[in-house]
């Protein structure tokens, strides 16, 4: 009886090993490398201004007047560098005000300006419009003063007022330049309202012009000519 019990104990582990199921090891999951995100550049734009207002005293910015016109060649020309996909045109749009301390004393200085401008491609296709509206009551409502004038402190009477941050998406098909043109201006005064659409009139001013885009890939290097033997 004792011998039979010992024999059963000796064979029990081997029987257990035969009946135990082994779980196969899982293969490691395959990892795919993500493509790197495209590099986006944000630069100060190169632009040609047909009507310079001047340099700001407080900001040091270049201010350029937006003229009413119909031909894109007569507008503010902004260079668009080589790119892939759409481009964001970013700038700040201001109204123009002729400052008069005398009108402020007389409580006749109030103005409400609404200026509408357009951004066009060079084939005269409208990309988008932008509007800036602001009110002037006192000198504190001026965005900046412009240096180089005959007024007190050497500043010009005309100054930017109001500030609208504008972002316009240019389609990928725009490859060289865009033009900023004025469309119309409404001025509300204490004694009435004036509307201006005549060609060649400055109706607004812009500053801080930037471009945001994905640069075009570098051109492929030319293939080397085979060496003659």
Regions found by a protein language model. Name each.
Residues 75-105:
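Contiguous beta-strand segments within globular domains
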Residues 54-67, 128-172, 187-190:
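Extended, solvent-exposed segments with strong compositional bias
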Residues 11, 15-42, 218-229:
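Compositionally biased, proline/threonine/alanine/serine-rich low-complexity intrinsically disordered stretches
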Residues 2-12:
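Bacterial N-terminal signal peptides
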Residues 26, 30-71:
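N-terminal leader/pro-regions and domain N-caps
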Residues 83-91, 167-187:
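Noncatalytic modules at the cell exterior or secretory-pathway interfaces
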Residues 103-115:
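Short coil-to-beta strand junction motifs in C2/discoidin
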Residues 184-229:
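Surface-exposed edge beta-strand/loop patches
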